[in-house]
Amino acid sequence: MSISAEDLSTQPQRRKLPEIAELIDETLKAYPEKFAKRRAKHLNVYEEGKSECDVKSNIKSVPGVMTIRGCAYAGSYGVVWSPVKDMIHISHGPVGCGHYARAGRRAYYIGTTGVDTYTTMHFTSDFQEKDIVFGGDKKLAKLMDELEELFPMSKGITVQSECPIGLIGDDIEAVSKKKAAEFGKPVVPNRCEGFRGVSQSLGHHIANDSIRDWVLDPAADKHPDFESTPYDVTLLGDYNIGGDWGSRIILEEMGLRVIAQWSGDAPSRSSTASSKSKLNLLHCYRSVNYITRHMEEKYGIPYIEFNFFGPTKIKESLRQIAAFFDESIQEKAEKAIAKYQPQWDAVVEKFRPRLEGKKVMLFVGGLRPGHTIGAFEDLGMEVIGTGYEFGHNDDYQRTTHEIKGNTLIYDDVTGYEFEKFAEKLRPDLVASGVKEKYIFQKMGFPFRQMHSWDYSGPYHGPDGFAIFARDMDMAVNNPVWGLTQAPWK
């Protein structure tokens, strides 16, 4: 179906709760009865004031549907480990998974590629049929020897297991332990085979556990010369997918010392210094909450979740962070806010009249289905539907603080459901992932790819709001939408 610009401009006002509930029921009629009952638990309309979204989450997708989720391998390698710039990350298995994981997600960094940084390079054991039959441990060991010879300045190696490794039972832990002793540097095995768990969320957990067991805890007492200050913080869950250095910059402007960051533009020593932090600051809670809670329990380091999308949330987060420290930090936080306020005001003045009242449907992973809502609202836009690829119940609980009543909630939405909801609700903008991008554009909907800022960005941080506003305006108000028509029309 093609939606013209005229259709979008004449769409009805925000629907009431009963109408959206009817839309859910109508959409589910296309499914077999048993599956419809199962999917109904993942769809709901949020009622104002409730502390729950009342949707089931973190449950396996049903085989045969077009799910938007990724796998455990994507969560471990593609999200958490790959941005660690001075370690070599081996995709252990067939070449395809490693290629798409490496090429599909950006992670900006400072360094010389192939000398002291390796993020954009693809290292694979290139499993073949004979490796499935005879095992791949010897091949993995040989690969590590070659990498150590070719890249002696690397600070370590991680092994990211693909599906065949778990199926044939290779002992990557034994190989890693042996090579770590030979090389004198960490060699970290990750049992992140794609068939494990529900989604990429398990991969985050596996990566967090390997950081804890192989990097953080073993090095916790190896910093005798570390000079601590009262203002030491660690930045966690910030992956620098589009040059997102702004978060660190504004934290330093308010007087804090960022002693470690994980894992965007992060050297491996970042995690080893984290145990000395006075406060952990979480950007993406879902992907790093496991290691954060471990650090709270073992090292007594508290944490705060922050949101640097849009001026309203930036100011709110800065003041929350500053309240943990003394008055000098609180004063500097206010000075930082005052510094950027004119810039934010100018952005709102320019773009809000062009975007006021425009409706948005979100479906992303990690934090964006909730965190970006404030930035859209700063521009006068209204989020009418949102959901998580791999969210857990606590993600939806926190989202209730961001959304309004009558917002459509969809967990692990199927391709059919997402298209049907958009067709009926007629949003002015759909913000989701690369798999959805071209489908909705062919339907005539303006679209922004929110996993990697649609190859633009950054969208968060003090300077990111201007780019965010420009890109939303560029998508929504592009005259091409008045000319487009679905290819099958």
Curated annotation (Swiss-Prot):
InterPro entries: Nase/OxRdtase_comp1, Nase_comp1_asu, Nase_comp1_CS, Nase_Mo-Fe_asu
Cofactor requirement: [8Fe-7S] cluster; [7Fe-Mo-9S-C-homocitryl] cluster
Keyword RNA-binding: no
Classification via PROSITE patterns: NITROGENASE_1_1 (PS00699), NITROGENASE_1_2 (PS00090)
Top-level lineage group: Bacteria
Annotated keywords: ATP-binding, Iron, Iron-sulfur, Metal-binding, Molybdenum, Nitrogen fixation, Nucleotide-binding, Oxidoreductase
Cofactor note: Binds 1 [8Fe-7S] cluster per heterodimer.
Family classification: Belongs to the NifD/NifK/NifE/NifN family.
Function recorded in the entry: This molybdenum-iron protein is part of the nitrogenase complex that catalyzes the key enzymatic reactions in nitrogen fixation.
NCBIfam families, per database record: N2-ase-Ialpha, nifD
Entry protein name: Nitrogenase molybdenum-iron protein alpha chain
